[in-house]
Amino acid sequence: MKIIGIEEHFVTADIRAAWAASPIGQEGTGGFDRGEIEMRLDDLGEQRLALMDESGVDVQVLSVTTPALHNLEPEESVILARRTNDLVAATIAKYRTRFQGFATLPTAAPKESCCRT
């Protein structure tokens, strides 16, 4: 039987920068120490795979961490959604048997959210 971790969070440097620059100034990982948890959120490669193996997790379903793109301007959220979804797709392609992913939606741009981003 496979062990599958659902909604396994990650974040990108682009998203962190957007959070910091937003008028709300909400950095979603601000409550984390800038140590191991941040490194785990940033990694979509060998370190994550090693932790999965250590924990007996066969597959992770990747999902950008909260607040995702919810508090960003519509135009910026569309650009970041595309970049993030491309990154997830590339990660899945590289590690086909280990990762799946949820789409990141630009919720500030509802019409764009229903289209491929």
Q: Model segments located where?
A:
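Helix-coil boundary/capping segments in enzymes
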Residues: 1-117
